[in-house]
A protein has these predicted regions:
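Catalytic cores of secreted/periplasmic lytic hydrolases that degrade extracellular macromolecules
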Residues: 1-198
Length: 198
C-alpha cells in the first residue's frame, strides 16, 4: 500500500521537471502507476520513484526516448540501444510492474505479459533467488551498490511534497450578483415553462 499520495507524486514530478516528456498528462501517469502496481501488490509510490530515477524525472536524454513509454529502462544496455517500446503509457507502466515482479515473485503476474524481458529476468531470479526488498535491486536490476538508495531518496522527496491544491478564487460582489442573476433567470424560465403547460 502506498504511503505517499498521488497528489504528492504529481507535485514532486512537476517541481522536479516542469517540462516532462510524456505521452500523457502527469496525473494520468501517476494514476496508471497506482492502478497497475496495486493490482500486483507492488508499492505504487516506490515503483514511481524508481521510474523517476530511471528516466531522470521524465527528461530522458539517455538511450530511451520519451515516446517509447519505457519508464524503467527495459532492454537498454547502453551504447545507443533504445530498449523496449510500448504502444501506450499504460502498457509501459504495466511492463515496469511486471519486470519488478520478475525479480521479486515466484508466481506470474495477473495480467498478460507485456514485458519482453520478463521470462529471462524471472528465470534468472528463480535460479539465483528472488529479491525480497527494494535494496535487493542493488547490483541486480542496475549495476552499482547505491541504486536503491537513489530510489529511496527520490521517494523521500515525494513524501516531502505538499500536494498542489486547486486555486479557489474568493467570491466578489460582482460574481455573487452574476450567480444570483443566473438563479433568477432559471427560476423565471421554469415559471414560464410551467405557465405554458397550463
Amino acid at each position: 500500500e502506498a504511503i505517499a499520495s498521488k497528489a504528492q507524486a504529481v507535485a514532486y514530478i512537476l517541481a522536479a521537471n516542469p517540462a516532462v516528456k510524456l505521452a500523457c498528462p502527469v496525473e494520468e501517469l501517476v494514476d496508471l502507476y497506482w492502478q497497475e502496481a496495486k493490482r500486483e501488490n507492488v508499492r505504487p509510490d516506490l515503483a514511481l520513484a524508481q521510474s523517476l530515477v530511471e528516466t531522470g524525472a521524465y527528461r530522458y536524454g539517455g538511450d530511451v526516448l520519451h515516446h517509447q513509454n519505457n519508464f524503467c529502462g527495459l532492454g537498454t544496455i547502453g551504447g545507443g540501444v533504445r530498449g523496449a517500446s510500448f504502444a501506450t503509457p499504460q502498457l509501459g507502466v504495466r511492463a515496469h510492474i511486471q519486470h519488478l515482479l520478475a525479480y521479486t515473485q515466484t508466481k506470474r503476474p495477473s495480467t498478460v505479459i507485456v514485458d519482453p524481458r520478463y521470462d529471462l529476468a524471472h528465470n534468472i531470479r528463480l535460479e539465483r533467488g528472488v529479491v525480497n526488498t527494494w535494496y535487493g535491486l542493488n547490483g541486480t536490476w542496475a549495476m552499482g551498490s547505491l541504486y536503491c538508495e537513489k530510489i529511496m531518496a527520490t521517494y523521500q522527496k515525494i513524501l516531502a511534497q505538499q500536494p498542489v491544491e486547486p486555486e479557489i478564487k474568493p467570491a466578489t460582489a460582482e460574481s455573487v450578483k452574476e450567480k444570483n442573476k443566473k438563479k433568477r433567470s432559471m427560476k423565471q424560465r421554469v415559471s414560464e415553462i410551467l405557465q405554458e403547460k397550463k
